[in-house]
Regions:
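Short cationic/low-complexity microdomains
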Residues: 2-4, 116-137
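Intrinsic disorder/low-complexity segments
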Residues: 59-60, 100
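Generic beta-strand hydrophobic packing signal
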Residues: 43, 62-68, 72, 79
Length: 162
């Protein structure tokens, strides 16, 4: 492959492929990559009520690959709880209600929670997730609260399948 001798239009965000020496063409869309799909900043780890994580409207279907919790305000020695596809701890858990957050001892700590089988092996969409005002959501709800004021940030990581 040498210098570019002829070029066509390549759609922004698409790959470029060589057709022959000096000629390129549109190579199609970039393969889906993992990224932050949604987040809940300052999630309260001292309550056991629902805390919905709203999925942006542009994600109609996605694969959840991990949930990361970080930036804990204090050492989360007591907090235990999971993630659910519906409010009031409804539906098959995405993350078990027994998930501990005790590994988070400093704001710099990072915990990739353990996805349950449903969380790791499901194509999420409106067929299996609840919604708030037409927006898909995954609910975070503790089984056991920390006992004192505590917050942390939660990030849903996945692949857009829209």
């Amino acid at each position: 492959m040498g210098a570019l001798l002829q070029s066509g239009n390549v759609t922004p965000g698409h790959l470029v492929t060589w057709v022959t020496d000096g000629v390129v063409q549109d190579g199609g869309a970039t393969p889906a990559a993992q990224r932050v799909l949604a987040s809940l900043r300052g999630a309260n780890f001292n309550i056991t009520t629902d805390q919905p994580i709203l999925i942006p409207l542009n994600f109609v279907a996605f694969q959840l690959t991990s949930i990361i919790v970080t930036n804990a305000s204090i050492s989360l020695t007591t907090a235990v709880g999971g993630f659910y596809p519906a409010g009031s701890k409804g539906g098959t858990p995405v993350v078990s209600a027994a998930q501990s957050y005790s590994a988070l001892t400093t704001p710099a700590g990072l915990l990739a929670v353990t996805l349950a089988s449903f969380g790791a092996n499901t194509r999420f969409s409106s067929t299996n997730l609840g919604a708030i005002g037409g927006q898909l959501a995954i609910w975070f709800a503790l089984t056991t609260a920390q006992g004192v004021n505590a917050v942390a940030d939660i990030y849903l990581i996945g692949t857009d399948l829209t």
